Amino acid sequence: MTERGKQTVVQVFASAGWGGGEQYVYDLAERLQREGYGVQLVSRESEVIRRKTASLGCPLVQFPLRSRFGLRSILKMKRLIESVEADIVHTHQFKDTFIALFARALSDRKPKVILTRHLVRPAKRNFLYSYLYRRTDRIVFVSELARRVFLSSSPKIAARSVTVIHNSIPPCRLQTGGVVLRQRYGIPPDTVVVAYAGRLHPEKGVEVLLDAAALLKSEDFVLLVAGQGEPVYEQRLRDRAKALGLDGKVVFTGFLDDVPQFMRQVDIGVVPTVGQEAFGLTVLEFMQAGRAVITTDNGAQPEFVASGTLLKDKRDELMKQFLEIVRRNRELRELLGAAARKKAEEALSYEHFFREITAVYRDRS
């Protein structure tokens, strides 16, 4: 416990890179510190993690974390649990959870071990994982879909050990003096700006979006594709846009530093994912920005997105039809955007998320 009587939480980053899961840990660590909790960060050897977390002011230690049976990592985790007097070890993938459980078994100090599950996959049912399910104090799923698919393989796990807490993101802090989007890309004032923001990967559906844009290329709009991916795949997308005759209609912006500022200057956000997402944070970011957002229904999106903006079919023709309706009707865009912001501020607020996750930390059952 800290001097303010709050728990000390060890947060374990799931990878050496930086993505939605790492941002989840960063945001939670920042808020926990502000509320008086003790926070200790753990990650694999990673300069990215070290650089990104420097501004938090939390202590960071880096372990190998290569194997669930890595003795060096287990012993380091044991010593860390004891030295910081940890009350909670919060992990974000199974491999790290094994390390936390084995470390706790070796230690006189017995912190709660909590796992947040960020993926949509059935549970494994072998002996080792049955051990993990019995020993982990709580498994938090970021969506009902993630929980349902996990339990579909009938793992041996107590119902009280499983809970759903929808992801959230803190209200964005807009930077002042940012670039005006239309000026940067030479977009006329009346041209509708459609945007995708996120990782460029086949499962994200950007190719479907390009095909839909090609069906609308005689209309007055510009599609901004913001984000990065593997260079070969990025080039494939650029080549596809060129082959579809979308020169002047599609702009690949590359990586953006201030995504919230970007989102607030577009008219329509599109998240055309073709893979099952446990919880699409990009959708929530567009909602926070008060933008009309069009997305597919193949992940957890139906749990938090209005049905009117969900596409039940990922084909380009259907996406084209919906884009055309929203693009042509400014009043509809504004109505959808206002409803999205209201949902983000109420049911999906970071305040709500933080209350739920800290209630799990405090729960003594």
What is each PLM-predicted segment?
Residues 42-48, 197, 222-235:
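Glycosyltransferase donor-sugar binding loop
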